[in-house]
Amino acid sequence: MLLLNASGCLDALTAPEVARALDVFVTKTVTPEPRQGNAPPRIAETDGGMLNAIGLANPGRDAFFADVLPRLRSLLDGEIWLSVGGFAAEEYAETCRCAPAGELAALELNLSCPNVDEAPESAAEIVAACRAATALPLFAKLSPHAWDVGETVRAVEAAGADGISLVNTLRGLTLDGGLRSTLARGAGGYSGPALKPVALAAVHAARRATSLPIVGMGGVTTGRDALEMIACGATHVALGTVLFADPHAPARVRADLDDAARDVGFASHEYAFCAAHADVAITVN
């Protein structure tokens, strides 16, 4: 199992020691052109997690490859995955085409970007365009909105995806004391512990549909949470919102994982893989 961060939940330039505790650092989503992002406030705490409406703020592809990536590479010894975003298939593909293979281990395609249709055929179109543009491994990152998980997973696999990441945030809204949205933009992406049941269901359904590697994320804060992701079929696990509150979360989750497995009768977490699929035979690449 590899331990990753969810894209956008960790700045390795300001907290390299946290990133070094992970097996893989996933960058913020990079788009072809620089983006300022949404107006503040764009983050709000909730009872069960947090909302964000960052708006894909990033320096743009050229500046990222020229300035940010070399700095990340100088600070980190582990794998770096680039989160790729865009507003059309060719925008994704062009960033993949420009990605320096010697500096990156994989590309995670953020298929939940604004104006991107999340229908299976649309997701597959983006993956196919990126597959034609790069030999780097491609992980398709999916949201839990408005699609059949298995159908979408099968579509992106047929289009050339090498792995699946899920889930991205749920759309949510909170109100302040004056009954106005706490975020300037209105609704935002909801994440945190309360997202875990949604994420587990998505990982479980995805594993029934594919033998590809799966990065499970959404509400993971403890070793037990990570074990549940593995039991549902995740080969790797990512930490998200917890990183904002606990910089020691990677070490803590990793240390607690096998204890959590032993608590339910497994010698280690590896033996719990797909335990939630006891009724069917599961094969994994």
Please name every model-derived segment.
Residues 190-210, 221-285:
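Alpha/beta catalytic cores of nucleotide-metabolism and tRNA/nucleoside-modifying enzymes
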Residues 1-80, 86:
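N-terminal capping/small domains of soluble enzymes
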Residues 1-4, 75-82, 133-144, 207-217:
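Short beta-strand/loop segments at the ligand-binding rim of alpha/beta enzyme cores
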Residues 14-19, 90-101, 146-159, 204-210, ...:
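Catalytic cores of alpha/beta
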Residues 8-9, 83-87, 142-148, 167, ...:
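Glycine-rich beta-to-alpha transition loops that act as phosphate-gripper elements at the mouths
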Residues 5, 25, 64, 82, ...:
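Conserved, mostly hydrophobic/aromatic
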Residues 50-51, 58, 111-121, 152-212:
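Glycine/Thr-rich beta-alpha phosphate-binding loop at enzyme active sites
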Residues 28-32, 106-113, 163-173, 219-220, ...:
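Glycine-rich phosphate-binding active-site loops on the catalytic face of alpha/beta enzymes
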